[in-house]
């Protein structure tokens, strides 16, 4: 794969997160924290307007943009922080930008935003080039 500093990739990784997506992720991950599937708990105990997606679901969706772009073998490291909750109905767009290349490894800044342009995931990946 040929990459150069400044190369970018942007993709909508999910249109309208559904409660079904969140519930399926809970089953796949084994994370049944009620904040993610029970409005009564999310609102009453958590003080949130509704349930919200697992951070790792958002990370996984963002990671799909990276592997679609770079290929699953090239991706060597990937880490993020969750900057805002992802709510049912949100549409997520992930963007990667090559910020450096050294010794055959590209460093890629990653940001995923919701439909309002608010960052929900920020991080960095490294890929073999």
Segments the model singles out, each with a brief description of its role:
Residues 33-35, 76-77, 82-83, 99, ...:
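Short, intrinsically disordered/low-complexity patches at protein termini
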Residues 41-47, 82, 125-129:
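Short C-terminal domain-edge/linker segments immediately following a structured domain
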């Amino acid at each position: 794969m040929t990459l150069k500093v400044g190369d970018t990739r942007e993709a909508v990784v999910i249109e309208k997160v559904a409660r079904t997506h969140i519930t399926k992720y809970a089953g796949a991950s084994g994370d049944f924290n009620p904040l993610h599937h029970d409005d009564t708990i999310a609102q009453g105990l958590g003080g949130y307007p509704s349930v919200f997606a697992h951070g790792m679901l958002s990370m996984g969706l963002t990671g799909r943009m990276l592997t679609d772009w770079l290929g699953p073998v090239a991706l060597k490291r990937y880490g993020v922080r969750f900057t805002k909750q992802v709510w049912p109905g949100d549409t997520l767009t992930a963007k990667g930008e090559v910020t450096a290349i050294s010794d055959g490894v590209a460093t890629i800044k990653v940001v995923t935003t919701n439909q309002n342009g608010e960052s929900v995931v920020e991080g960095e990946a490294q890929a073999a080039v």
